[in-house]
Amino acid sequence: MQAALMAFFMLLFSLLSLLGIAANGFIVLVLGREWLRYGRLLPLDMILISLGASRXCLQLVGTVHNFYYSARKVEYSGGLGRQFFHLHWHFLNSATFWFCSWLSVLFCVKIANITHPTFLWLKWRFPGWVPWLLLGSVLISFIITLLFFWVNYPVYQELLIRKFSGNMTYKWNTRIETYYFPSLKLVIWSIPFSVFLVSIMLLINSLRRHTQRMQHNGHSLQDPSTQAHTRALKSLISFLFLYALSFLSLIIDATKFISMQNDFYWPWQIAVYLCISVHPFILIFSNLKLRSMFWQVLLLARGFWVA
């Protein structure tokens, strides 16, 4: 890839990362302020603040890793820093996947019009489970991180006491990253993705049928209620697309199909981090509380800039 084109993709990745960190940070600050003021949060806000915190940290860790690795490839590839980065990245990525899944389940039980007794029972019970599910997600992510640490323990040990040669460390990393990690990551990420997929498809189907029923009963496309359901459908479909893109990108990334030396590395990193950078804006504009605060901040910034 030409140097100018690579610089363009690096700049695009940087801008996307800054926007993602800013949007996720905004969600955390707004909801954190409300938490401090009232001493509690609604189940939806609990998930949003957890998701915003994990996504922002994940985006920050990924950005630092990509630019540090591109600047010091040889030293970083065989050093201890790379191993510790992966531990942080696996923890944050796993937590983010689970938080997204619980967000889709909460949307489903709150909005979907399904009369099955099991669904009605879940609709009643799920909001009360949210704090424990979030805590459980953090615990699961920590256990998964320990699992990766255990698999990589010989590398950490030998890097610390300097018995491995750089070549032997590289061979060990290549072996476990080629044969062990891809299958392990596929299993770990497929569980929350399956939960997400089932709940989001149930919700999309319910909203689609409800919108068609409203149009059949004489509601026009310009009717406020119809427009609200149409906007909700578009938001959910966008969420589904971004989450699926993130899942597929991470699975392919786990196979090391596209390495740092590959010409398409930076475009690929844009695809990997697209969901955690773009979806926060969808959440902000679809949430009345976050949207109103966002416009207030923009007006304040505009007034400060003009002054």
UniProtKB/Swiss-Prot annotation:
Cellular component terms (Gene Ontology): membrane; plasma membrane
Protein keywords: G-protein coupled receptor, Glycoprotein, Membrane, Receptor, Sensory transduction, Taste, Transducer, Transmembrane, Transmembrane helix
Glycosylation sites noted in the Swiss-Prot or TrEMBL record: N167
Membrane topology, record value: Multi-pass membrane protein
Gene3D superfamilies reported for this sequence: Rhodopsin 7-helix transmembrane proteins
GO molecular function: bitter taste receptor activity; G protein-coupled receptor activity
Calcium found in the keyword field: no
InterPro entries: TAS2R
SUPFAM superfamilies: Family A G protein-coupled receptor-like
Ranges annotated as spanning the membrane: 8-28, 41-61, 89-109, 130-150, 184-204, 235-255, 265-285
Subcellular location: Membrane
Principal cellular location given in the protein's record: membrane
Membrane topology (Cytoplasmic): 29-40, 110-129, 205-234, 286-307
Keyword Cell cycle: no
Other known facts: Most taste cells may be activated by a limited number of bitter compounds; individual taste cells can discriminate among bitter stimuli.
Chain's role: Receptor that may play a role in the perception of bitterness and is gustducin-linked. May play a role in sensing the chemical composition of the gastrointestinal content. The activity of this receptor may stimulate alpha gustducin, mediate PLC-beta-2 activation and lead to the gating of TRPM5.
Protein name: Taste receptor type 2 member 41
Taxonomic placement: Eukaryota, Metazoa, Chordata, Craniata, Vertebrata
